[in-house]
Amino acid sequence: MSVKHTNACGTGTGASPLEAYERAWACDPTSAFGGILAFNEKVDAATARKVTGQFVEAVIAPGFAVEALKVLGKKANLRVMNMDTTGIHKASGFDVRRVMGGLLAQQWDLHRLERDR
């Protein structure tokens, strides 16, 4: 997923993190430029090489291959964050947004996506 200023710019699924990234970026590359990339699986070296060809501020994922960290580490001013997803599907809570005159609240959507569906 690509995000900029808290707005989703694109999402994608694929057989690999690279394929998912390419589909997400293709949704709206102009808006994704300078944003944040979020992955729901470990980032491999091929994905890292592709990511460093774009201008992004940060990459967050539940893990990075050693070679991917080496590749990403060479990109100036790129923030790389490892996200611990242990127990995330057992969490509960609400996403709250302010709107003029009130609040919007909805329960977190923590359903797992399956590749074959």
Language-model regions, residue ranges each:
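ATP-dependent carboxylate/acyl-activation modules
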Residues: M1-R117
